[in-house]
Amino acid sequence: MAGPVLLFKEGTSRSSGRDALRNNILAAVTLAEMLKSSLGPRGLDKMLIDSFGDVTITNDGATIVKEMEIQHPAAKLLVEAAKAQDAEVGDGTTSAVVLAGLLLDKAEELLEQNVHPTIIIDGYKKALTKALEIIDQLSLKIDVNDLSSPTAKAQLKKIVSTTMSSKFIAGGAEEIDKIIDLVIDAITIVAEKRPDGTYNVPLDLIKIDKKKGGSIEDSILVHGLVLDKEVVHAGMPRRVEKAKIAVLDAALEVEKPEISAKISITSPEQIKSFLDEEARYLKEMVDKLASIGANVVICQKGIDDVAQHFLAKKGILAVRRVKRSDIEKLEKALGARIISSIKDATPEDLGYAELVEERRIGNDKMVFIEGAKNPRAVNILLRGSNDMALDEAERSLNDALHSLRNVLMKPMIVAGGGAVESELALRLREYARSVGGKEQLAIEKFAEALEEIPMILAETAGMEPIQALMDLRARHAKGLVNSGIDAVNGKIADDMMKINVIEPVRVKSQVLKSAVEAATAILKIDDLVAASALKTEKGKKEGGEGAGAETPGAPSLE
């Protein structure tokens, strides 16, 4: 008789079959439950404290899952779904994670009835395909032919308002209106129209800076770029018109040699000669920049005090230690070429701007570059009373920018407030009857999961969720396809379009895709093998993501 077979290293744990699947489902559902209360315009905020003690207060799904240090591999799949949603459309992250959790919760009910995971996956995929078809039928095309027209701007404002209603920490109408106006103006400038009537919206041309002080209403849109730096020398001009700008990633200083070297000096004359040579070298670099016509120098690296003196004598405005990301944006905006070798610089390397000026913003000085060669480069300067308000305003701004980009890339909208989910649930139940076999059960569970979205919206708005769901079902059965939860006023509206609660089709479709992909990925797993943790000399555990995982049992998200 053969002895026991040792397949894994000592300490390795394994769970398989339904145990592994239930463990994974529980982890994912636990994460989704945490995010449920943050969904919608009345969603609550989460306070996240990282290992350094830094505090983040937000209800933005992408930020929440990024800040939480989640360990369980199944829950990490939902985090990846949120990241995919954020990368693709920049909005709907909370919805994607919550819906994935709901789909898995419903799948577990089917597993209890001995429905095989493969059948559930096939049913969910069929439901997704049908749901995307229905969304296209429910969608309304909007006219974005002329973005400067009042009609188009009014439509865009409605879309941004829906996105902002659930995001903005300050919550004041004036602040929200200010941000909405900034977003629409910025998008209108950078958008490029395609032959088919849609737009390419390069968001990398929109730079966002934050400066503490004042209020959100003091935020401004700059037609150019803003550098959070000040002019390096008191003798330099503070304002340069018709600026010819040299963008450097080379240092304007004498760099130390990479080899180890010592200089032996035996007399004061040698010291003077040494310093004179350094000054001559720096003067040559400044003279070279002046000779190609530069009257503004923006440098990624340092500028020596002696070089600053020579630049000031030439009347050149200079800024140093500018971030690499800003240098790259300047290259695009100014039509410049980044200069790596000053001695090889030519006039063709220079960028152009109508005005470069140092201004005081709050307690700090900033350099404004306006009238750039590329007129589509813009900078939004956010103001706010504290860092947390500024951070949340920036997240709100990014979501709003992505929301507008989505609708310009695909100018189709649907009703918000859970109206689409309610109508999808109704039609998917009808569709399920036409599908044979146990897949019908999975499609019905998909419909149930979708219906929980308006229930969550109702609950966060302080409404009775079950009563709200019953009312919604009745209205949709009567043909009110746009009926949904008016969370702001705490009631059910017959037409969410009329009260300007609308969402881009691109976001809504991607939410469904991301949620189904994450849920099906978890349902496919039937074996969980966790390697034993490595131990240090002191007996502390070490290892990768799977180190120290405990299975089976209740999952830990920490």
From Swiss-Prot:
Sequence segments annotated as region (Disordered): 536-558
CDD domains: cpn60
Short name of any one Pfam family annotated for the protein: Cpn60_TCP1
Disulphide linkage map: none
An annotated Gene Ontology molecular function: unfolded protein binding
Highest taxon of source: Archaea
Alphabetic keyword roster: ATP-binding, Chaperone, Nucleotide-binding
PANTHER family listed in its UniProt record: CHAPERONIN
Function field: Molecular chaperone; binds unfolded polypeptides in vitro, and has a weak ATPase activity.
UniProt family annotation: Belongs to the TCP-1 chaperonin family.
The protein, known as: Thermosome subunit alpha
Annotated source species: Sulfolobus acidocaldarius (strain ATCC 33909 / DSM 639 / JCM 8929 / NBRC 15157 / NCIMB 11770)
